[in-house]
């Protein structure tokens, strides 16, 4: 790989120190590297960490400096671009962002030498409707959660798969998870761990009000 782009979470790397170190090392190795300019207020943007339209078309890899949350959000921002992402951990969790300061140069060397395995990860698209009107639409690399809030005590869910009724849940919420998300919220709610490269969807109830309720595993095209 020869052309790189760096996205940095300003809360995790406030001075851009890690991003600058990455750029300096890649330049030392004779490679191109662009650091994304710091963005304006999130409330004024349609994206959170990066504007996918500003990333050069010839970019071969995007390095995301932050924690797992930063990487998950960057994947959502980059949904329309087919560019590999690599997380550089500066957060409290580093399950997805595997690179840290101790092995950063080694990881960059492997990228430069094309000595890497690129994993394809599935994503979810979720839409919320009210009275047949679409309220919102978004994407997720890990999971989509529908949960109670405020004084709402319990939610009755009717689950349909491809238009066919599957079952009902009475629970505090439900987690629709990808394989990537199977080790997150879904796992803490009693869901199974599956290979991150699998092609399937997990449905896991949150605090179900029956004792024999378990997660459901569905095909990816459900």
Where are these regions (language model features)?
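Short, well-ordered beta-strand core segments
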Residues: 62, 85, 174-175
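N-terminal glycine-rich "phosphate-gripper" loop used for MgATP/nucleotide binding
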Residues: 64-68, 75-77
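Gly/Ser-rich helix-loop-strand patches that form or flank binding pockets
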Residues: 73, 78-90, 95
């Amino acid at each position: 790989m020869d052309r790189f782009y760096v996205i940095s979470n300003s809360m995790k790397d406030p001075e851009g120190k890690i991003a600058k170190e990455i750029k300096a090392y890649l330049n030392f190795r004779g490679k191109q590297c662009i650091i994304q300019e710091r963005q304006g207020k999130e409330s004024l943007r349609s994206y959170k960490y990066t504007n996918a339209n500003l990333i050069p078309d010839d970019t071969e890899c995007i390095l995301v400096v932050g924690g797992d949350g930063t990487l998950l959000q960057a994947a959502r921002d980059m949904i329309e671009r087919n560019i590999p992402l690599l997380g550089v951990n500066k957060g409290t969790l580093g399950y997805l962002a595997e690179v840290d300061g101790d092995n950063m140069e080694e990881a960059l060397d492997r990228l430069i030498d094309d000595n890497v395995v690129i994993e394809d990860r599935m994503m979810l698209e979720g839409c919320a409707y009210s009275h047949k009107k679409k309220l919102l639409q978004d994407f997720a690399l890990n999971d989509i959660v529908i949960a109670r809030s405020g004084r709402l005590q319990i939610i009755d869910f009717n689950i349909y798969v491809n238009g066919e009724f599957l079952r009902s849940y009475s629970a505090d919420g439900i987690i629709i998870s990808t394989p990537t998300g199977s080790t997150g919220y879904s796992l803490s709610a009693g869901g199974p761990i599956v290979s991150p490269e699998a092609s399937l969807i997990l449905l896991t109830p949150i605090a179900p009000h029956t004792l024999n309720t378990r997660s459901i595993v569905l095909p990816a095209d459900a």
